[in-house]
């Protein structure tokens, strides 16, 4: 059985990891052993934060809608409840955009929500 030398495979694996660690600080971008740990940790952070991003954007949208609806005299929860009663189905992402960029339209939505709450 011939002897198998694994230099080519090892070099390729090391290059792959060091390429992924490019731009990291200090030994994390130069030393294979440290770079492996850094790349694994970065992958864990990326996996976690892809999920957190969805939560954080929803929080941002709610904060923006709340601020805009309070300027029009209605709390966030009552505003959303009013929209549901008025059977206006606009998601929070679009509501937040309207609240920031088109205050007149948002004010009319708040008025419709108020009307639905008083009925």
Curated annotation (Swiss-Prot):
One of its GO terms (biological process) is ribosomal large subunit assembly. Pfam families: Ribosomal_L20. One of its GO terms (molecular function) is rRNA binding. The keyword RNA-binding applies. GO terms for cellular component: ribonucleoprotein complex; ribosome. Keywords: Ribonucleoprotein, Ribosomal protein, RNA-binding, rRNA-binding. Binds directly to 23S ribosomal RNA and is necessary for the in vitro assembly process of the 50S ribosomal subunit. It is not involved in the protein synthesizing functions of that subunit. NCBIfam families: rplT_bact. Belongs to the bacterial ribosomal protein bL20 family. This is Large ribosomal subunit protein bL20. The gene is rplT.
């Amino acid at each position: 059985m011939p002897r198998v030398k694994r230099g080519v495979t090892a070099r390729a694996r090391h290059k792959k990891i060091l390429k992924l660690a490019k731009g990291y600080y200090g030994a994390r971008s130069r030393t294979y052993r440290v770079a492996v740990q850094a790349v694994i940790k970065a992958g864990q952070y990326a996996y976690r934060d892809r999920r957190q991003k969805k939560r954080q954007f929803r929080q941002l949208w709610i904060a923006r809608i709340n601020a805009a609806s309070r300027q029009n005299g209605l709390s966030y929860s009552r505003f959303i409840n009013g929209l549901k009663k008025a059977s206006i189905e606009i998601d929070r992402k679009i509501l937040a955009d309207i609240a920031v960029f088109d205050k007149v339209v948002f004010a009319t939505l708040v008025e419709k929500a108020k009307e639905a709450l008083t009925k």
